[in-house]
Amino acid sequence: LHKEYRRQRQMCIRDSAKSDDKHLQERGHNKAYCCYYHAPVLVIVSNKPTQWWAGMDCACAIENMFLAAHSLGIGSCWINQLGTTCNDPEVREFITSLGVPADHQVYGCVALGYADPKAPLKEKVVKEGTVTIVE
């Protein structure tokens, strides 16, 4: 890729464990809600929406973060909320103060932390017919 396009993707890393900012800790009037599941680190991945591949570029970066985190024994989770709310004036002001460029669209966030070993794991059931093998 041309170096100009490679430089467009931006990652803003927030140490949310040290944050007392209510924007990250609460949403609306539900005090129990936490959009990043109380993870100690939140990575906000954004890009200029001027190219059709901007979202895919961010998705690839996020997936690579998931793979790297897993290799280090760190849990990860894709967070979508900022992708749909980043252009709300209050949210935009807040994420710009964190370092997200004003002309960027947020395509996803990554919550990183160590999994709670006591938390029950949900068994994933793959529905029949959702995978097709073409020979």
Q: Model-found features: residue ranges?
A:
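Short secondary-structure boundary/capping segments
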Residues: 3, 33-35, 98
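C-terminal helix-cap and adjacent tail motif
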Residues: 100-135
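Short acidic (Asp/Glu) patches
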Residues: 19-30, 90-94
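Small-aliphatic-rich amphipathic alpha-helix that forms the alpha element of a beta-alpha
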Residues: 43, 48-94
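Short, charged beta->alpha transition segments
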Residues: 11, 26-36
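Single conserved hydrophobic/aromatic residue that forms the stacking wall/gate
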Residues: 1-13
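Helix-biased detector of long, well-ordered alpha-helical tracts
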Residues: 27-31, 44-52, 131
